[in-house]
Amino acid sequence: MADFEERRLPVGIQSFKEIRRNNYAYVDKTEIVWNLVNRGKKYNYLSRPRRFGKSLLVDTLQTYFEGRSDLFEGLKIMNLEKEWKTSPVIRLDMSRAGASEKTIRSYLSMAFSREEAKYGITMHEGASLADRFDTIIQTACQQTGESVAILIDEYDSPLQHSWKTPDHEACTAVYREVFAILKADDEYERFVFITGITKFTQISLFSVLNNLSNISFDEPFAAICGITTQEITDYFGPEVKAMGEANGWTEEETMARLKTNYDGYHFCRSNMVDVYNPFSLVNALADKDIKNYWATSGATSLLLKFVDDMEIKLTDYDHSAILSTIIETSDVTGGGAELFLYQSGYLTIKGYMNGLYLLGFPNHEVRQALYETVLPALAMRKRGDIQSAQAYLYMHMYMGNADEAKKFMKALIADVPYSNKKLASMDMEDRYRLIMSTIFNAIGFRVEVERMIATGRIDMVVTTDNYIYVIELKLAKNGGIAAAEKQIVDNRYTEPFKADKRKVIALAVELDDQGKGLVDWKEVEQS
């Protein structure tokens, strides 16, 4: 490992070659890579969420197949690979292919032209993309005397972005036409590796490759992308220390904050190892700050396209279940919201029992990103119209100024329980509970709804770095503030939190019976 002063973190860098040549910090995944290539399975598929290191993995594989042993010096693979054999590599990055038949054909034509030039191939005018791909694979093998490695990165990008548009079927037709060649040219291929986020089974990648090995749930490859706690200790100790010093945190506190915000992903059913989102983790270490990096990178852009009524159902997904037959094999277009949310990284595996996967939010960053995404739809306002009120609500709640925070909560809730017709089937108090918990989650606070304690059930517990808010809701017709205050006092709702070093603020909240909004709230004095 280089001295800390010399180290650079590979923020946004997806090139293994660039990382190794320019002395960026690198988490050594090469033993897992070697095992993947040399386990005797030719066709392999890996699903991982966006910004999880798939492209870096593909580039690492390309470098390995190119026989560039010089770039692997000092890494684990050097103890495993005895013969650095060079193989021809065909690499396609489908994230560059747009979302229409025209753009996909244009990208593939450009990529194939590059390969044809490399091998001196001249095709007749009007040759189909499938014929060109077929000729490239066979010629590369014949000219080099070595079987071909084919790497297809982000295969599903055009299919995701064209989903629910008139272009989608034409896009899938191109895939069926071109990638059927992979099976036909089996004898010329050494290794085929496909990455993606979501699974579209109606295309030929999955229908014709009968022996396609889906390693997405395999325990040996659970940490092939992402970063584990042990890897943070092994590779980023100086950065963790520097981050703590910059913020006045101990190393233990720094690790706890990183874990809460970016850890929690699991990709297998047994012996689950915690995996951090690498994009967010490396950015946080580089900035010496805790921010929501994943959402700002565009990770939530397709969410509302695949999940209907997300704003109403979101709380249900945090403790959901899905059959193993669905999560492991089904098409994203027919597998339900939970399948899309899992494949896209919004949910992760929390447990497994009797053919059933238990799912939940992986970490605080994802939870906040989801609630922030759905809040405008729930509040029936544009994001820009509510951002100011959100910011002021956050500031005053964070500072413990509940009285000032009240006016901004009023502004955010105003008329929503009455006007949002999607809430019509819900009890009025449940509507308020959903809206308020969504708002608190969206601004980054930790929220427990209907928290059970020995003396009763608290409507909501909201925690910040310095305060714990114990909140009881009552409609005006049910006694409003007076009834809420009495329940807090009689049931000693603040008692379980007194050992916490944070200050406890109890709020008795009165809500309009007809759904017109927050009437008032009051801090309850505690004995």
Kindly label every feature range from the protein language model.
Residues 149, 467-469, 505:
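Structural motif
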Residues 169-175, 475-494:
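Mg2+/Mn2+-dependent nuclease catalytic core
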Residues 140-144, 439-465:
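Active-site metal-binding core of divalent-cation-utilizing nuclease and nuclease-like domains
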